[in-house]
Amino acid sequence: MLHFVWLSSIMSVMITLLILIYWFMMLSQLHNIITRRRAPSLHQKIFAHSKQVTPYLSGSFGALHSKSIAITNDDSHKEIKRVYDGLAQSHPEAGKAYWLTRTWDLVCWQPIYVTFISIYGLHSLPDIKNIGQFRYKEFVTGYRFFNGDHQHGSPEELIPQAGEAILALTEFYRSQISEWTRIRPGFTNHLLADLLLGSLIKLQQHEPSLTNDYITEQAKLWLEACQLPENHLNSLKIDADSGMLKLIRISCCLVYKCDSRKYCDDCPRHPDNKKTAQ
């Protein structure tokens, strides 16, 4: 009888905790809805273009809440740590190196994608430095701007300013992660270079009229703006089939360490890419 009462008590506590977690998540989503404001015209276009790239890149306009991953929130490291912990729970077999690499890529992908969409799609640049991001379980999806600041210009005019914003953001993310683990600048710089060059490859795939020379020149501008070595250009190769550029990354995302996963097509460890690199 006592054993039954003890089990009932434990179950009651667990159910209460689950209900509290559910309502906490609902309140966070409700805050986003309540504080959402009508976005300026440019931002509406950015949001529309973003969703065409992927539904996970969902933008909004309004106040940021305390759970946002943003340069204005010194407690961002708590949400980033929850991303890391979620990855560790979902993929315990992959190990710490994968969890950290994946966490870094997750906090960086949206600012980079939004920057590229804005510059190459709309010849504009919103206030990327102050972008807010949201965590959903072990994923970072959804972003928000709380002001309508923006600039217009050609890619050549906007890339230096975008580089400054990206450098400020990535340094902030690194400092936040440093609150709970060691993360080297050299490690994050390689990942950033791969993300930038990979975005340019996607740009050419989306717009095949952009020549290899143009993409290479743009790559030089991005590397310079983000204070990354120009030798990263060696990662760009000519695809034998399409004649377009392809990327062989410097860094490995380590996803192959997850159960039932393989090397990515652009992985430096992939046998085909080892032949190309020689």
Where are these regions (language model features)?
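Intrinsic structural disorder/low-complexity segments
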Residues: 5-6, 113
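Low-acidity, Ser/Thr- and Arg-rich intrinsically disordered low-complexity segments
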Residues: 6-12
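Generic N-terminal leader/targeting and pre-domain segments
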Residues: 20-100
